[in-house]
Amino acid sequence: MMKKALLLVALVMLTTMTMTAIAQQAVPPENAPVPAMPKEATRTGKRVNRIIDMWLKGQPVYYSQISGGGYEQGKQMAATKADYITYEMEHGPLDFKELREFMRGLLEAGPTRTGHKTPAVIVTLPIPGTTDALRANAWMIQQALAAGVHGILLCNAESPEAARLMIEAARYPFAPRVDGLAQGTRGNGSQAYASRMWGVTAEEYMRIAEPWPLNPDGELLFGLKIENPRADANVETSVRVPGIAFAEWGPGDHGFYVMGRPGTYKDGGETSPQMAAVRRRVLNATKAAGIKFLNACNENTVIDQLKEGVMICTGGDSPAADKGRAFTKRTDPW
């Protein structure tokens, strides 16, 4: 019994020492150089991220979606009218090699009509948006960013803590300090391929691979899918996490919880009062937080959606998107 007790004490001491060492490593030395957060963008000319360019002009953006695909699919989609492409790996194959090849195809078949090297690419991942899942799977966020994408949409984003962990996983340890965020954890080497996809030096990539608009020089966008009642309960807090730029309300998954089936529409409107209430809550939360709201749009609803404040619409290559671009008098090439 005495040996077991001593062994238990030793294990507890070892665990405590290990956790203390990890905690100490997470705190930068007092003399470590920490750049100040710029108050406004210091770069001039076209942004890397086409979405940001459009938003800075007050324009809504439109996206298309692909579930996986490599080099050839990237080449084919380089000519899209869409401002960005959702590369769907929540339910599609989780294949980071293919993602890298897709980005290379976009780059080599570019530039876009607007003069950007590629359309922006936002990735979804099979990470449940809970605190424990984010702690265990932050590597997926870092792998996606290392492929040169322009942002992450966190699915089933249930808690502010999960949103915060996503942002911290995406930032480098030397990034400007931000109240409400711990030091970033993204590692050296992640800049090599990504900087080539962006057409910048590795050093410049590490400076601008930051969440926008938190960092005015940032070129990365991070969003939340509010898709279930647990996420609804925290939405007003989650959307205020530093570094979050947009959110959507996930009607398909919400329908499972509210109606026992995927959400249904009639001309874009919700057929269930409960679903309409969920959408309204998420929309109001984004407006209060000063971030963008994403919603499905079709030809019958796109104008009303834009009037309501929707700044991200589906159907990047569709007549609905063309109708929306004309309504907001977009001057950039379609």
Give the location of each predicted region.
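Bacterial N-terminal signal peptides
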Residues: 9-17
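Sec/Tat signal peptide C-region and signal peptidase I cleavage site
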Residues: 19-23
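Expand to "…catalyze enediolate/carbanion chemistry for C-C bond making/breaking, isomerization
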Residues: 24-334
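Bacterial N-terminal signal peptides that target proteins for export
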Residues: 1-9
